[in-house]
C-alpha cells in the first residue's frame, strides 16, 4: 500500500503526474491531488484519487494532506517570467511554500519528496552565453536575472538542506531529489494556448524573434511526469538505488528536437495554417523595452500588464540552452515514455481542439 500526494496536482504538470501514477503505478492505493484550484473532472478519473483544495502556504491543510503519505511530489509553485505576479508573491510561494512542504513531510514521516525544479536554476540568462548539450556538471556562469529562477534555486537548496532529516529518532529520514525540466509542452499547456489565441488575434500570423540558428530543449509533459514517477520509485526502493538518487538534481529532457522557440512552435501548430514572420533583433529589442516601460508605468496605477515579450524573455529566447539526461538514465533508468512522434501527435490533437 503506497500513498502519493502531488502538490499542484490539478495544474498542467501536476495533473499529468497524477494521471501517470494512476496508469503506471499499480502498487499505489491512494493519490491526493492537492491544489489551490481544483479540477472537478479529475475526481472522476479513479476511485484511488482524492482531490483536495489547499495552498502550500496553509500549513495546517498541507499537514493534513500529507499525513500517511509515502511519497510527496512537489510541483506547486508560481512559474512566471512575465511579471504577472509580484516578486514577493513568487518568492513566498516558491521558497516559503517549499519549506512548508518539507517541514510537513518531515513531521509526518514521509519517506520521499520529489521536487519539481527548473532548468532556469542553471540558465539561460542574459550574460553567460550558450549552454549546448550540457549536463549537471557542465560549467556555466549562473546569474539569476529574475526572481523566478532565483526562487527555484533557493527552493532546490532547501530541498538539499533537509535531505536526510527526520523529525525524531526512529522516524524515516526524508529522501529527496530535484528534477529540472526544460520548457514543457503538451496537452493543457497554457503558454501554447496563449500563443494560439495571440496568433489568431493577430490575423493568424505569429511574430517571433528567436534566431533560426538558436536551439532550445523542449520536453513533453508526459515524459516529465514519467521521470517524476521513476525518481520516486528509485528513492522509495531504498538500498543502492535510493543512495545514488538521494539529494541529487537531474535535468529533465526527452528526444524532442532541438530548435528555436519559434521553429518548435511552428512544428506543433503546422496544421492550423498560421503564417510566421521573423522580426529582427533591432526591432524586437526596443519593443521589449517599451513593454517593460509600459508595464512599470501602468503598475504605478494598479494596472497589471504582462506581455510575453519583455527584455528578459527576449534574452532567453535568443540564447541557446540545451541539456542531456544521461545522469537520470544512469542513476534511475530514465528513458522517455513517449517518442517525439507520439508527443507531437498528442499535442497537435489537443491543439486542434483550441478555439
Curated annotation (Swiss-Prot):
Keywords, in A-Z order: Oxidoreductase
Cell division found in the keyword field: no
GO molecular function, one term: oxidoreductase activity, acting on the CH-OH group of donors, NAD or NADP as acceptor
Keyword Oxidoreductase on entry: yes
InterPro entries recorded: 3Beta_OHSteriod_DH/Estase, Lipid_A_modif_metabolic_enz, NAD(P)-bd_dom_sf
Matches recorded under Gene3D superfamilies: NAD(P)-binding Rossmann-like Domain
Pfam assignment, any one: 3Beta_HSD
Biological process terms in GO annotation: steroid biosynthetic process
Protein family (similarity comment): Belongs to the 3-beta-HSD family.
Protein name in UniProt: Uncharacterized protein 052L
Taxon lineage: Viruses, Varidnaviria, Bamfordvirae, Nucleocytoviricota, Megaviricetes
Amino acid at each position: 500500500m503506497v500513498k502519493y500526494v502531488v502538490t499542484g496536482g490539478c495544474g498542467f504538470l501536476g495533473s499529468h503526474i497524477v494521471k501517470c501514477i494512476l496508469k503506471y503505478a499499480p502498487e499505489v492505493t491512494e493519490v491526493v491531488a492537492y491544489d489551490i484550484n481544483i479540477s472537478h473532472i479529475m475526481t472522476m478519473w479513479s476511485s484511488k484519487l482524492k482531490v483536495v483544495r489547499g495552498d502550500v502556504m496553509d500549513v495546517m491543510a498541507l499537514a493534513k494532506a500529507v499525513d500517511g503519505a509515502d511519497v510527496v511530489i512537489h510541483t506547486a509553485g508560481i512559474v512566471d517570467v512575465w511579471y504577472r505576479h509580484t516578486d514577493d508573491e513568487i518568492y513566498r510561494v516558491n521558497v516559503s511554500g517549499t519549506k512548508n512542504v518539507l517541514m510537513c513531510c518531515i513531521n509526518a514521516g514521509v519517506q520521499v519528496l520529489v521536487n519539481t525544479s527548473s532548468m532556469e536554476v542553471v540558465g539561460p540568462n542574459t550574460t553567460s552565453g550558450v549552454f549546448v548539450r550540457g549536463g549537471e556538471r557542465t560549467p556555466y556562469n549562473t546569474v539569476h536575472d529574475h526572481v523566478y529562477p532565483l526562487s527555484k534555486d533557493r527552493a532546490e537548496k532547501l530541498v538539499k538542506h533537509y535531505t536526510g532529516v527526520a523529525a525524531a529518532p526512529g522516524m524515516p529520514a526524508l529522501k529527496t531529489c530535484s528534477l529540472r525540466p526544460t520548457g514543457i509542452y503538451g496537452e493543457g499547456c497554457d503558454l501554447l494556448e496563449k500563443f494560439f489565441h495571440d496568433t489568431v488575434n493577430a490575423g493568424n500570423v505569429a511574430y517571433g524573434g528567436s534566431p533560426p540558428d538558436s536551439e532550445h530543449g523542449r520536453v513533453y509533459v508526459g515524459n516529465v511526469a514519467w521521470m517524476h514517477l521513476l525518481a520516486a520509485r528509485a528513492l522509495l526502493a531504498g538500498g543502492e538505488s535510493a543512495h545514488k538518487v538521494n539529494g541529487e538534481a537531474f535535468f529533465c529532457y526527452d528526444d524532442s528536437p532541438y530548435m528555436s522557440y519559434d521553429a518548435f512552435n511552428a512544428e506543433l501548430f503546422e496544421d492550423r495554417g498560421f503564417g510566421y514572420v521573423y522580426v529582427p533583433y533591432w526591432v524586437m529589442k526596443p519593443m521589449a523595452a517599451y513593454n517593460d516601460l509600459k508595464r512599470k508605468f501602468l503598475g504605478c496605477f494598479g494596472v497589471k500588464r504582462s506581455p510575453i515579450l519583455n527584455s528578459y524573455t527576449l534574452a532567453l529566447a535568443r540564447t541557446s540552452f540545451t541539456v542531456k539526461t544521461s545522469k537520470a538514465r544512469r542513476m534511475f533508468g530514465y528513458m522517455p515514455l513517449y517518442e517525439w512522434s507520439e508527443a507531437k501527435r498528442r499535442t497537435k490533437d489537443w491543439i486542434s481542439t483550441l478555439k
